[in-house]
Amino acid sequence: MADKFHILLLNGPNLNLLGTREPDKYGHTTLADITADLSALAGSLGAEFSHFQSNAEHALIDRIHQARGNTDFIVINPAAFTHTSVALRDALLAVNIPFIEIHLSNVHAREPFRHHSYLSDIAIGVICGLGADGYHFALQTAVKRLSTSN
């Protein structure tokens, strides 16, 4: 790895519509706003940051595979794939990169089918219900964990 830690942010389906999609649940902040804020935060923490969003499960899996060997930590909002994707789980296990699962809304206060996650039991942690701030907490936690483990 390089001298700087590399953090990868992955966002799943429909998150490209943030800011306009159900703002009562997801807020008015756009994905572009979130990634710009995180890029600046990562820079201030001395970390490298990249991000990828896709509505396609296979594209997210491919990006996870590409992360092996050049990414130190993943922050992932799998969105609806949280509740359905064994394939994302298997990809994350295969690359063995620590990750935090994040959700803008409190999935436990929503429909029962949203209460189950195929990722949470293998994640370092799960952040939900804190809106865009949750992404900041996840990034800060990732850098702190990497800094104390090296």
Curated annotation (Swiss-Prot):
Pfam families: DHquinase_II
Entry annotated with the keyword Lyase: yes
Catalytic residues as annotated in Swiss-Prot or TrEMBL: 26, 103
Keyword entries, A-Z: Amino-acid biosynthesis, Aromatic amino acid biosynthesis, Lyase
EC number: 4.2.1.10
Residues the record marks as site: Transition state stabilizer: 21
Positions that bind substrate: 77, 83, 90, 104-105, 114
Gene Ontology molecular function terms on file: 3-dehydroquinate dehydratase activity
Reactions the enzyme catalyzes: 3-dehydroquinate = 3-dehydroshikimate + H2O
Pathway: Metabolic intermediate biosynthesis; chorismate biosynthesis; chorismate from D-erythrose 4-phosphate and phosphoenolpyruvate: step 3/7
UniProt-listed GO biological process terms: amino acid biosynthetic process; aromatic amino acid family biosynthetic process; chorismate biosynthetic process; quinate catabolic process
Record note on quaternary structure: Homododecamer.
Family: Belongs to the type-II 3-dehydroquinase family.
Function summary: Catalyzes a trans-dehydration via an enolate intermediate.
Protein's name in the database: 3-dehydroquinate dehydratase
